[in-house]
Amino acid sequence: MSHPALTQLRALRYFKEIPALDSRLLDWLLLEDSMTKRFEQEGKRVSVTLLREAFVGPHEVAEEVALLPVESRYWLREILLCADGEPWLAGRTVVPESTLCGPELALQNLGKTPLGRYLFTSSTLTRDFIEIGRDAALWGRRSRLRLSGKPLMLTELFLPASPLY
């Protein structure tokens, strides 16, 4: 059974262009650096609650597949990023199987390590785009990232306790 925050994350609807929003809100939504690091800058101890890690078929990641290479399997990781034990962010990472070679194979073994701790230590990380999304009162974003030119999708939903609000 899926966590309610993941249901909300999948319900995000994305803006075609960056909306006119308060600068503080945009600062969070368009952050290029690690969200883990940003939460730690708020003086919090960051931890991961792992909800799901598994290979899945394209039908389970249909929205992300539209922005990734078509493959038969994708590595799916769904988490809650918590600050002092309180969920601040729901995250969903979709990685094409072809991305999981060489150093990027480590993406399968993150366990309770925040994704940002891995991604933002890589000198090969690039970001193709950030799209801002909203579902009811909650804000989120998604990005296509590349490690050594190999793509993955990261979707993040800011939960009500997050300092974004």
Swiss-Prot record:
Superkingdom assignment: Bacteria
One matching Pfam family: Chor_lyase
Binding residues for substrate: 35, 77, 115, 156
Gene Ontology annotations of biological process type: pyruvate biosynthetic process; ubiquinone biosynthetic process
Enzyme Commission no: 4.1.3.40
Catalytic activity: chorismate = 4-hydroxybenzoate + pyruvate
Predominant location category: cytoplasm
The protein's enzyme class: lyase
Membrane-spanning segments: none
Pathway: Cofactor biosynthesis; ubiquinone biosynthesis
Compartments it resides in: Cytoplasm
GO MF annotations, alphabetized: chorismate lyase activity
Keywords: Cytoplasm, Lyase, Pyruvate, Ubiquinone biosynthesis
Family: Belongs to the UbiC family.
Role according to the record: Removes the pyruvyl group from chorismate, with concomitant aromatization of the ring, to provide 4-hydroxybenzoate (4HB) for the ubiquinone pathway.
Protein name from the UniProt record: Chorismate pyruvate-lyase
